[in-house]
Amino acid sequence: MGALLNALRQAWASDLGVQWENHFLLDTTPVIAVGYRRDKHHSDFLGSAAYGYCAARRMKYFGYKLAMLTTLDGMPYAFELLPANADERAAADEILDSLPPNSYVWSDKGFIGDEWQAQWAETGRHIWTTKRENQLSQNPPAFDQLLNCVRERVEGAFDILKEGGRSVEHTLAHTIEGLCSRTLAKISGVTLRLYLRRFLGIDVLTYTITA
C-alpha cells in the first residue's frame, strides 16, 4: 500500500512540474512515537526511535525526526524519518542527494556548518542559512531579510502536515509500519491538495471550487 501511495504522490508531483524546480525549503519536525514518560520496553519503536529535543518547541520527546525538502510552494519533494537524536545535518544528508545539480536550499540555523555546506556546494547543492551572531562572516542584511521571508514559507509547509486528524507529529500509531504509513499518507495528502487546487480548482479546506 505504501509503495502505491508513494507512486501516486510522485505522479501528482510530476504533473505539478516538480522536476523543473531548483529552489527548495529544508527543515525537520518531531514525530512522537510514544509518550515521553511511558514505558518503552515492549514498544515496537524500541531500537529505532530515540529520545530527542526540539529547540524550536522547547520540547523533549521520544520518537523520530522527519527531515523534508519541499518546493517554495510547499510541495513535498523528499523526506526521511530518523531517530529523534539525529543531528540536523545528518538528517539532511539523507535527502539532499535526491536534488538535481544547481539546486538552492533555504534552511535555518540548525543546518549551519561552513565545511558541510561547502561540501554540498561542490556537488551543485547550495545551502543557504542565516548566520549566528558570533560568526566572523555575516550575510548582507538584505539577504537575511529574504531568508526570513523564505523561513515563513518553510514553517507554513510544515504547518500543513500538522493540520486535521492524525497530525504528522502525533500519528497515534502503535507500530513502526503504521507510523511510516500514516506519515506517508499525510505527506501525500499535501501533494494531492496542491494537485486538486491547480487542476480542478478545489480547495480541500473549504470544500469550494474556484472558477
State what each model feature region is:
Residues 1-211:
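Short alpha-helical elements
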